[in-house]
């Protein structure tokens, strides 16, 4: 239930609040926030695996939340928000927006695969899918995030 509320809130933000933001800097703050959430979800999954925590369904729920964020992430990078405020977003995002959308989709797909693995409870499979998701993040960062 809690996960569904989080996903619904994220979806509402991407389709309403972000779309209505008059200040381009609001997009920067929004995307920093959701990307930070993604990082924190991944860290939580890693801790759960490493420490063998008994938190039923959380890994799958976190992975599904990441997938939801990745599905809507490109909307947080509209024209006119490049170079606004302090950001690590490279101009390559707007120069080749289709490639950015493909990278986001790869992360979404990897997160859904992680969620599926998590539902089996197979820790080796979960670990492998978490690494695969991390690989999609790394590839996107290499192309679209400044150091």
Swiss-Prot record:
GO terms for cellular component: periplasmic space. SUPFAM superfamilies: Cytochromes. Keywords: Electron transport, Heme, Iron, Metal-binding, Signal, Transport. It comes from the Bacteria. It comes from Rhodospirillum rubrum (strain ATCC 11170 / ATH 1.1.1 / DSM 467 / LMG 4362 / NCIMB 8255 / S1). One of its GO terms (biological process) is electron transport chain. The keyword Transport applies. Coiled coil: none annotated. Homodimer. InterPro entries: Cyt_c/b562, Cyt_c_II, Cyt_c_prime, Cyt_c_prime_subgr. One of its GO terms (molecular function) is iron ion binding. Binds 1 heme c group covalently per subunit. Heme c binds at residues 31, 87-88, 137, 140-141. This is Cytochrome c'.
């Amino acid at each position: 239930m809690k996960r569904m509320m989080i996903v619904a809130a994220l979806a509402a933000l991407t389709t309403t609040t972000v779309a209505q933001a008059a200040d381009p800097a609001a997009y920067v703050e929004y995307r920093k926030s959701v990307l930070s959430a993604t990082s924190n979800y991944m860290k939580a999954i890693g801790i759960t695996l490493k420490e063998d925590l008994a938190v039923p369904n959380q890994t799958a729920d976190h992975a599904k939340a990441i997938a939801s964020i990745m599905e809507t992430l490109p909307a947080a990078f509209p024209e006119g928000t490049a170079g606004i405020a302090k950001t690590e977003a490279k101009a390559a995002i707007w120069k080749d927006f289709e490639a950015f959308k493909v990278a986001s989709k790869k992360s979404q797909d990897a997160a859904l695969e992680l969620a599926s693995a998590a539902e089996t409870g197979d820790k080796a499979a979960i670990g492998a899918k978490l690494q695969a998701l991390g690989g999609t993040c790394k590839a996107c960062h290499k192309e679209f995030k400044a150091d």
